[in-house]
Swiss-Prot record:
Record's compositionally biased regions (Acidic residues): 126-135
SUPFAM superfamilies to which the protein is assigned, alphabetical: RING/U-box (SSF57850)
InterPro entries: DUF4632, RING_finger_E3_ubiq-ligases, Znf_RING, Znf_RING/FYVE/PHD, Znf_RING_CS
One Pfam assignment: DUF4632
Protein name according to UniProt: RING finger protein 227
Family matches, as SMART domains: RING
PROSITE patterns: ZF_RING_1 (PS00518), ZF_RING_2 (PS50089)
Organism of origin: Mus musculus
Zinc finger (RING-type): 18-81
Residue ranges of the region described as Disordered: 108-147
Keyword annotations: Metal-binding, Zinc, Zinc-finger
Length: 190
């Protein structure tokens, strides 16, 4: 019975990943941004900054939609189709989702307290990857030495640019909770 009480009633409440690319939000390039919508059509859906940039750059895929996006500077929500105006500063000026942002800050703070050296790549929020496989292998190994931690930080710095380069989103991105569950189970990125 306790297990049932821990599970949120809505799956969206416990999610810390983008519903477009299925990658986890972070404090850097994948910060959670909440689409405001317009006075007529309120939106409120949350996307990561990278997906929002991609949507702003390509529009809906049709030439007329791309032209309208350039003229009016608006992004159409992929879930509810509500238009959201882009501020003059671009995608990074859209307000952050305060609930998700605070949860990400708490998560980062907990990770920093767990690692006394404070890994710079993790603190900057640039590394949005899951290192579950590495974490599982390190759990039984005991605390890593300072030399291994320094080597890990150097590797994170060297590999950070390559991790940021990702394939672009396909033009026909569909949202389906079942597809998302399958993606999480197979640990693949759609």
């Amino acid at each position: 019975m306790q297990l049932l009480m821990r599970v949120p009633s809505l799956p969206e409440l416990g999610e810390l990943d983008c519903n477009i690319c299925f990658r986890p939000y972070n404090l850097g390039a994948r910060a959670p941004r909440r689409l405001p919508g317009t006075a007529r059509a309120r939106c409120g859906h949350t996307l990561c900054t990278a997906c929002l940039r991609e949507l702003a750059a390509r529009g809906d895929g049709s030439r007329t939609a791309a032209r309208v996006v350039r003229l009016r500077r608006a992004v159409t929500c992929p879930f509810c189709r509500a238009p959201s105006p882009l501020p003059r500063g671009g995608v990074t000026e859209i307000a952050l989702d305060p609930v998700l942002w605070s949860r990400l800050e708490e998560k980062a703070r907990a990770e920093r307290e767990g690692d006394p050296m404070g890994s710079p790549a993790k603190d900057s929020g640039e590394d949005g990857e899951d290192d579950d496989g590495e974490a599982e292998s390190e759990k039984g190994a005991g605390p890593p030495s300072a030399g291994w931690r320094a080597l890990r930080r150097i590797l994170d710095r060297v590999l950070a640019p390559a991790r940021r380069l990702r394939r672009p989103l396909p033009s026909n991105v569909l949202y389906c909770p079942e597809v998302k569950d399958i993606a999480h189970m197979t640990r693949c990125t759609l």
